[in-house]
Amino acid sequence: MGQEQDTPWILSTGHISTQKRQDGQQTPKLEHRNSTRLMGHCQKTMNQVVMPKQIVYWKQWLSLRNPILVFLKTRVLKRWRLFSKHE
């Protein structure tokens, strides 16, 4: 166990804590002190990848004064154009 404590993973994430099983044996816990922080970091990294698309969508959404009316207007115009072509 002395060698395990020298590994960078254990030094960077903190100490290994143990838990007692029902039969009385102690086993190392899988989670670390900083596991929550690590998960948050992973989520932030993933969000940074998706963020530019979201910004574009939000800018488009905010540029519309009333999104429902704009949607209906474009839908009616498309149908009108299709109807006009068939006549």
From Swiss-Prot:
UniProt-listed Pfam families: PB1-F2
Gene Ontology BP terms: symbiont-mediated perturbation of host apoptosis; symbiont-mediated suppression of host cytoplasmic pattern recognition receptor signaling pathway via inhibition of MAVS activity
Compartments it resides in: Host mitochondrion inner membrane; Host nucleus; Host cytoplasm, Host cytosol
Site entry (Low pathogenicity), positions: 66
Sequence segments annotated as region (Disordered): 1-38
Entry keyword set: Apoptosis, Host cytoplasm, Host membrane, Host mitochondrion, Host mitochondrion inner membrane, Host nucleus, Host-virus interaction, Inhibition of host innate immune response by virus, Inhibition of host MAVS by virus, Inhibition of host RLR pathway by virus, Membrane, Modulation of host cell apoptosis by virus, Viral immunoevasion
Superkingdom of the source species: Viruses
Biased composition (Polar residues): 14-28
Stretches for region Mitochondrial targeting sequence: 65-87
Membrane spanning stretches: none
InterPro entries recorded: Flu_proapoptotic_PB1-F2 (IPR021045)
Cellular-component GO terms for this entry: host cell cytosol; host cell mitochondrial inner membrane; host cell nucleus; membrane
Subunit: Oligomer. Interacts with human SLC25A6/ANT3 and VDAC1. Interacts with host MAVS.
Additional note from the record: Is not encoded in all strains, and seems to be dispensable for replication.
Task performed by this protein: Plays an important role in promoting lung pathology in both primary viral infection and secondary bacterial infection. Promotes alteration of mitochondrial morphology, dissipation of mitochondrial membrane potential, and cell death. Alternatively, inhibits the production of interferon in the infected cell at the level of host mitochondrial antiviral signaling MAVS. Its level of expression differs greatly depending on which cell type is infected, in a manner that is independent of the levels of expression of other viral proteins. Monocytic cells are more affected than epithelial cells.
Similarity remark: Belongs to the influenza viruses PB1-F2 family.
Annotated protein name in UniProt: Protein PB1-F2
